[in-house]
C-alpha cells in the first residue's frame, strides 16, 4: 500500500474520460476513499446524487436543501439564477453538499469524469469531514435529523396553507424570513430535532405556549396600591437578542399554528448558523483535500497527465484571488485564503523558517497532519485567522488595511504587509469574520406589560455605523408578529437614547 510520504508508481491508470459512467464513478470513489483513509479523514456515510443543471438551479433556490417548505422567495431565486445562467452571466456550482447524515452531495451530470472526481474528493471527503468534526457543527447542528425535520416543516406549512389560506401563511413567512438572522441561540446548544419528536411534542407545545401567553397577558384589573416592586420591573429582565424565539413565546396575538411556523424558521436559521462562521475554513479544508488527494493519486500513477491538466486548470480558477484594483475584485476569495492557510500550516510543520518558529513556536516542526486536524476541529474563521495567519500568507496576498473613520474626510492606509503591520492586519482581518461586527446589534429591550403593550427594540451601533434605510420595512415585519406598537431606539456612545422609528408612525412624529 502507498504511504503518505513514500508512494510507488502504479502502471494501472484510471480512465480520464472525458465521459463518465456510474461504474467509473464507483472506481474513482473507491480510490479517493482509500487515499482519504490514509489521511485519517473521518466522514459521515455519503449519498451521491447526479442531477441536471436545472435541478442544480432548483437546489440553489432552496438554499441547497433536498426538501423545503413552499415560499415565493425560493421561486424568485430560481428564476433569477436561471436567467443569469442562460445569459452566461453566472455559472453554476459543480456540486452542492448538505450537512446531513448520510452527507448528501449533488454532482452535475454535465461534468467530465475529472470534475466528478474533483467534486467527490471536495464534497464527500473535504466538506463531509468538516461537517462531522468541526466544533461548531458538532455543537449547533444535528446532521442526523435535518432532512426529517424539513419533511415535517413542509408538511406542516402545507397543511396551514390549506387551513388558513396561502396568503396568510405567506405573510407570516415573509416576516419570519425578514428576521431570520435574529432567530439563533448563540450561547446554548439547541435541542436535537427530528420528525418523530416534533410530531409527538407539537400538540403539547401548542397548549403550553398558549397557556404561558395567557398568563403573561392576563388582564384582570388590580388596584394601584397592590402593585409590587417586581411588577414594576422591566420585562424582559435582560435584553433578548433572539427575536423570533421571543415572539414565539410572548407575542400576544399569535395563534398556536403561527408560533409553530416561527419555530420552524428559527430551527432552519439555527442549522445555517455555523456555516456563516466557517466559510473560509470549510472551503479551504475541502479545497486542500481535493488538491492533496488527487495529487496523491497522480503520484501513485493512478490518473493521467490529461486528467491532471484539467484538474489543475479548474483548481487554479477556484483559488484565484483578483487584486484589489481589478474590476473582478469582490472581496477576499474564501477558497483562496482558506486553501493558502492550510497549505501554509503544512509548510510550517514540515519546513519551518526562523520567522515561522518565532510566530508559531507550538506548531513549527510538529506533525502536519495532526496539526491540520486540530485546526479544523477547534476553530472558526475569526479565531482560525487570528491564530494561524502567517506573515508569509500576508505577503503572498499583499494584504494592507484601510482605515475608514467616519469622523475624518479621508482614508488611511494603517498597515501593510511588513514587520510593523503584520499583527494589525491579522487582527483587522479576523474581526471581519466576527458575526457580531457584521450584523446589527438589535435586542428586545422592553415590553410595556401594563400599558399599551408596546415593544421596544434597542440598537447599539458598532463603530457608530447607522442602520440601513430599510429598517422601516423590517420594523413593519416586527409589528406584524407582535401585533402592537413597536419602537426602535438607538443607544449612542455617550449613553443617550434616541428614538429612530416607530411602527405604526404617529401623526406629527416619525
Regions found by a protein language model. Name each.
Residues 130-193, 197-199, 283, 287-301, ...:
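Post-HExxH zinc-binding segment in Zn-dependent metallohydrolases
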Residues 120-129, 285:
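Active-site His/Glu-centered metal-binding helix of metallohydrolases
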Residues 102-119, 272-278:
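Short pre-active-site segment immediately N-terminal to the catalytic Zn-binding motif
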Residues 5-9, 23-103, 217-254, 488-494, ...:
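Auxiliary, metal-adjacent structural segments of Zn-dependent hydrolase domains
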Residues 17-21, 107-110, 142, 148, ...:
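Fold-level signature of zinc-dependent metallopeptidase catalytic domains
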Amino acid at each position: 500500500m502507498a504511504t503518505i510520504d513514500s508512494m510507488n508508481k502504479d502502471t494501472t491508470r484510471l480512465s480520464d474520460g472525458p465521459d463518465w459512467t456510474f461504474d467509473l464513478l464507483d472506481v474513482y470513489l473507491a480510490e479517493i476513499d482509500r487515499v482519504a483513509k490514509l489521511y485519517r479523514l473521518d466522514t459521515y456515510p455519503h449519498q451521491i446524487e447526479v442531477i441536471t443543471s436545472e435541478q442544480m438551479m432548483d437546489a440553489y433556490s432552496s438554499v441547497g436543501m433536498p426538501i423545503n417548505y413552499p415560499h415565493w422567495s425560493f421561486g424568485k431565486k430560481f428564476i433569477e439564477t436561471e436567467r443569469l445562467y442562460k445569459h452566461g452571466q453566472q455559472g453554476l456550482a459543480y456540486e452542492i453538499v448538505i450537512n446531513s447524515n448520510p452527507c448528501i452531495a449533488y454532482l452535475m451530470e454535465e461534468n467530465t469524469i475529472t470534475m466528478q472526481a474533483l467534486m467527490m474528493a471536495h464534497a464527500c471527503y473535504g466538506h463531509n469531514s468538516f461537517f462531522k468534526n468541526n466544533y461548531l457543527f458538532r455543537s449547533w447542528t444535528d446532521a442526523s435529523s435535518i432532512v426529517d425535520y424539513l419533511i415535517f416543516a413542509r408538511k406542516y406549512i402545507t397543511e396551514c396553507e390549506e387551513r388558513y389560506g396561502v396568503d396568510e401563511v405567506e405573510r407570516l413567512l415573509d416576516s419570519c424570513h425578514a428576521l431570520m438572522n435574529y432567530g439563533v441561540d448563540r450561547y446554548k446548544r439547541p435541542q436535537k430535532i427530528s420528525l418523530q419528536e416534533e410530531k409527538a411534542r407539537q400538540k403539547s407545545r401548542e397548549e403550553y405556549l398558549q397557556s404561558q401567553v395567557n398568563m403573561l397577558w392576563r388582564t384582570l384589573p388590580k388596584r394601584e396600591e397592590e402593585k409590587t416592586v417586581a411588577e414594576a420591573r422591566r420585562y424582559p429582565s435582560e435584553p433578548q437578542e433572539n427575536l423570533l424565539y421571543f415572539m414565539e413565546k410572548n407575542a400576544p396575538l399569535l395563534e398556536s399554528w403561527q408560533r409553530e411556523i416561527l419555530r420552524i424558521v428559527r430551527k432552519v436559521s439555527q442549522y445555517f448558523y455555523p456555516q456563516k462562521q466557517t466559510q473560509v475554513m470549510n472551503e479551504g479544508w475541502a479545497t486542500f483535500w481535493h488538491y492533496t488527494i488527487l495529487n496523491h493519486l497522480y503520484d501513485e500513477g493512478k490518473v493521467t497527465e490529461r486528467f491532471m491538466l484539467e484538474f489543475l486548470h479548474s483548481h487554479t480558477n477556484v483559488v484565484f484571488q483578483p487584486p484589489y484594483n481589478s474590476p473582478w475584485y469582490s472581496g477576499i476569495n474564501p477558497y483562496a485564503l482558506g486553501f493558502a492557510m492550510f497549505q501554509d500550516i503544512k509548510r510550517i510543520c514540515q519546513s519551518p523558517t526562523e520567522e515561522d518558529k518565532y510566530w508559531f513556536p507550538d506548531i513549527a516542526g510538529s506533525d502536519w497532519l495532526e496539526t491540520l486536524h486540530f485546526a479544523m476541529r477547534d476553530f472558526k474563521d475569526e479565531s482560525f485567522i487570528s491564530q494561524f495567519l502567517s506573515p508569509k500568507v500576508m505577503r503572498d496576498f499583499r494584504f494592507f488595511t484601510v482605515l475608514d473613520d467616519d469622523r475624518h474626510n479621508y482614508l488611511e492606509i494603517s498597515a501593510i504587509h511588513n514587520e510593523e503591520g503584520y499583527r494589525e492586519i491579522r487582527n483587522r482581518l479576523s474581526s471581519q469574520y466576527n458575526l457580531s461586527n457584521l450584523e446589527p446589534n438589535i435586542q428586545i429591550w422592553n415590553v410595556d406589560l401594563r400599558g399599551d403593550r408596546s415593544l421596544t427594540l434597542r440598537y447599539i451601533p458598532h463603530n457608530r455605523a447607522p442602520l440601513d434605510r430599510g429598517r422601516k420595512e423590517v420594523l413593519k415585519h416586527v409589528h406584524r408578529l407582535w401585533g402592537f406598537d413597536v419602537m426602535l431606539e438607538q443607544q449612542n456612545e455617550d449613553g443617550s437614547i434616541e428614538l429612530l422609528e416607530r411602527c405604526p408612525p404617529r401623526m406629527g412624529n416619525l
